[in-house]
Amino acid sequence: MSDADVSKQIQQMVRFIRQEAEEKANEISVSAEEEFNIEKLQLVEAEKKKIRQEYEKKEKQVEIRKKIEYSMQLNASRIKVLQAQDDVVNAMKESASKDFLNVSHDHHVYKRLLKDLIVQSLVRLKEPGVLLRCRKEDLHLVESVLDSAKEEYASKVNVHPPEIIVDDVHLPPGPSHHHGFFHHHAEAHGPFCSGGVVIASRDGKIVFENTLDARLDVAFNKKLPEIRKWLFGQVAA
């Protein structure tokens, strides 16, 4: 084989190797591009999924905040309604408390009422001796009905008339324009007393508060569900 033939054969082999190498390189390039595209697609999809999840999370948070805000507004509205209802009820109680002033100012009516309150208190305690406390301005009226009250009690329960000692310490005076009507629990018997009596056993272990204010509290609290139903069409919880 001549040198020319050898050279020609070598060139053919080189071209073949080069062509094969280029084909392999193209295959690798195509394969790499496909893998890159797949990875890129996966990354894009993963990022899309992440964005969707973030959006859904934020959307849920917004919904939760809306529900919380709505609940807070609803509760605030309910509190305002309840406060307005309480204001109406308290105004009724204040009006009733003011009416007691007229009762204590009518000495003839109030004198009879004081006697009834004393008898009722004696029946409740059923003690042979008691201590009575009243307002200073009621002292003369109380003293004027003590004997008849003791006799009426003794006749009712068939016992001897009890010994009643009028306490030197008096209940607070009647309310004036300087006092509110609903702060009467701030002191022992309140800063004011609309009238009535407080009777205790001699040892002080049994105390029956039979003041007009205490009677109003008992009656009002007892009737409060009916009052609320009448005013607002519902029974208080």
UniProtKB/Swiss-Prot annotation:
GO cellular component: proton-transporting two-sector ATPase complex, catalytic domain
Subunit and partners: V-ATPase is a heteromultimeric enzyme composed of a peripheral catalytic V1 complex (components A to H) attached to an integral membrane V0 proton pore complex (components: a, c, c', c'' and d).
Superkingdom classification of source: Eukaryota
Organism: Gossypium hirsutum
Function of the molecule: Subunit of the peripheral V1 complex of vacuolar ATPase essential for assembly or catalytic function. V-ATPase is responsible for acidifying a variety of intracellular compartments in eukaryotic cells.
UniProt entry tagged with the keyword DNA damage: no
Alphabetical UniProt keywords: Hydrogen ion transport, Ion transport, Transport
Repeat is among the record's keywords: no
PANTHER family: ATPASE H+-TRANSPORTING V1 SUBUNIT E1A-RELATED
Protein's UniProt name: V-type proton ATPase subunit E
Family: Belongs to the V-ATPase E subunit family.
A GO term for molecular function: proton-transporting ATPase activity, rotational mechanism
